Amino acid sequence: MKVSLADGRILRYWSSATTGPVVLVFHGCPDTRRVAMTGDAAAHEVGVRLLAFNRPGYGSSTPTDSTHTTVARDAAELLDLWGIERVAVLGMSVGGPYAAAFAAAYPHRTTALAVVSAPAMPREAPEGTIEDAMARMAPEFLAWRGRIDPDDEDDEALAARFLAELPEADAALLAPYGADLVGGLAWEALVETDGYLRDAALLMRPWDFDVADVRCPATVWVGEDDAKALAAAPWWTNRLPQAALEVAPGTTHLATLLTQWPAILRRLGTATG
């Protein structure tokens, strides 16, 4: 599904068929709205509605010179189009800063924040512009993208190649969702290059919002075996005014979300309800 924003750009989105408090999901990198589909069963169990969209440059969402704050504005416009006033927000991995940016910019609309497997903000920016950083990363990214070959119309083969690039524990949990979901995720994540490269470039420099401006209750979720996210967790808990930390035993990066969906949604749904 897609919507047209006021400036003419397209946002591709997905909504669960459930009813209840809305949880707005910000995907990781390389990732898409389809990661929210892995929480569909948990949404039914808990009684919440999931809403997720592809950031600019992913899938059919129009590329633009986006930042964390502009993506938060896109999310607010999407909610306006749906007539949704208040939401809980969930950010997976690189989506964590985007979810926090929304919570900081729209405190009156945000009931709770979940930051899952998210990185910390760097202290200093590298030399050059965001576009310079994107250009530097492009050759390595394009070589990796070429190995996955997102233009392959065989979902089974595409899903297999994408899963092979993930940590074994993450791939084992994602594979059962099927080639349609996984292959579609890989295609939307990689068919265009701007989304991934811009996400990576933005992650390498200080963000254009202050995490300390988040006013809602927040939970930082990390996996015990996700070393980078575990190391970043204190950065988040020390800056978010109302933060709790949850460490999922024996889980890696994506596995933290996939195994903790019910617990995450219960906490968000309670705050939203």
What are these regions (language model features)?
Residues 29, 224-226, 250-252:
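Acidic beta-to-alpha connecting loop that harbors the catalytic carboxylate
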Residues 9-60:
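Conserved HGGG/HGGXW glycine-rich cap/lid loop of the alpha/beta-hydrolase fold
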Residues 214, 220-222:
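Short beta-strand/loop motif that positions the catalytic acidic residue
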